[in-house]
Swiss-Prot record:
GO molecular function: S-methyl-5-thioribose-1-phosphate isomerase activity
GO annotation, biological process: L-methionine salvage from methylthioadenosine
Pathway it works in: Amino-acid biosynthesis; L-methionine biosynthesis via salvage pathway; L-methionine from S-methyl-5-thio-alpha-D-ribose 1-phosphate: step 1/6
One Pfam family from the record: IF-2B
Function comment: Catalyzes the interconversion of methylthioribose-1-phosphate (MTR-1-P) into methylthioribulose-1-phosphate (MTRu-1-P).
Name listed for the protein in its UniProt record: Methylthioribose-1-phosphate isomerase
Binding-site residues for substrate, renumbered to this chain: R34, G35, A36, R77, Q184, N235, K236
């Protein structure tokens, strides 16, 4: 498995070569790959590698190995629901093919990973079309973190909406919040959009209110790592603040995410686990410590935006209000 090392962008484009599920889990944990749909896809390929490693085991040993690999992968990033969703699909497939041996097991899991990958790309295009009509004909769209091709199987969720709008002839430019402390907006969103020829400017996270106050921003579009049944949205830390600002300034606040990001088993955002990451990711910048030794650092990686602040959610099923989410019936999930 070859994986673009996102931590080194935009300075260098380098691919990791991963040969087992443990390597994939480490790449997810350390954010060499990130973005809820992308880590779900990566986990699916990781499960295919686990199936390959256990291809000659007896049925019970094979299933045990697959469950262990799945548990390891699912534990790496607890907030993103796509990760567990992809692992459960892979374990369900492993239960079904446990009676087979050899390469057939590995081939079936590899094909499932490719299927999950294809589904995500198709979903991104569908939600892009659903959201494009809601963006203004011209002006500036604000986005946060990176919800583009790098965070998905391709095309993107929030950036997919922007791409689709521009492909439809709308004259839009993008303001990308830098997104401290990992700088996904500055490093990844700006890199993607520049490569696509889409006008983009980077601002610090604290500048968003100023540009809203000046009337420069016509819409906010972000991705999501998990959406609860009531429509609460967990996304990169700082999203909630942008939603509050958008409401104050009368700016529509949109969320774009595949249906796999909607967790109907979680009643509200209060039940979504919020990942706490290392203090050094915040306290060390460019190899230099910027926080005095001994001073505590808090580093929640995500926050929760209440449903009432979300104008609409764009999925492959079309535009949904947060109230409509709770009334939706999810596709049947594989057992396992």
């Amino acid at each position: 498995m070859f994986l673009l090392e996102q931590r080194e962008l935009p300075e260098r484009e380098r691919y990791l070569t991963l040969t087992d599920s443990a390597g994939v889990a480490e790449a997810i944990r350390t954010m060499a790959v990130r973005g809820a749909p992308a880590i779900g896809i990566a986990a699916a390929y990781g499960m295919a590698l686990a199936a390959r490693a256990a291809r000659d085991e007896g049925a019970s040993s094979y299933v045990a190995a697959m469950r262990a690999a799945g548990e390891h992968l699912a534990s790496t990033r607890p907030t993103a629901v796509n990760l567990g969703w992809a692992v459960r699909r892979a374990i369900a497939a492993a239960l079904q093919n446990a009676g087979r041996r050899g390469e057939e097991r590995a081939r079936e899991l590899a094909e499932l990973a490719r299927e999950i990958h294809r589904e995500d790309v198709a979903a991104c295009h569908q939600m892009g079309r659903a959201g494009a009509a809601r963006l203004p004909e011209s002006g500036t769209v604000l986005t946060h973190c990176n919800a583009g091709a790098l965070a998905t199987g391709g095309y993107g969720t929030a950036l997919g909406v922007i791409r689709a709008a521009i492909e439809a002839g709308k004259a839009l430019r993008v303001l990308a919040c830098e997104t401290r402390p990992y700088l996904q907006g500055a490093r990844l969103t700006a890199w993607e959009l520049q490569r696509d020829g889409i006008p983009v400017e980077v601002i610090s996270d604290s500048m968003a209110a100023w540009f809203m106050q000046k009337g420069e921003i016509g819409a906010v579009v972000v991705g999501a790592d998990r959406i609860a049944r009531n429509g609460d949205v967990a996304n990169k830390i700082g999203t909630y603040g942008l939603a509050c600002l958008a409401r104050h300034h009368g700016i529509p606040f949109y969320v774009a995410a595949p249906w796999s990001t909607i967790d109907l088993a979680t009643d509200s955002g209060a039940s979504i686990p919020i990942e706490e990451r290392s203090r050094d990711e915040l306290a060390v910048v460019g190899g230099r410590r910027v926080v005095p030794p001994g001073v505590p650092v808090r580093h929640p990686a995500f926050d929760v935006t209440p449903a009432e602040l979300v104008t609409a959610v764009f999925t492959e099923r079309g535009k949904l209000t947060t109230r409509e989410i709770s009334r939706s019936v999810p596709p049947a999930a594989p057992a396992g």
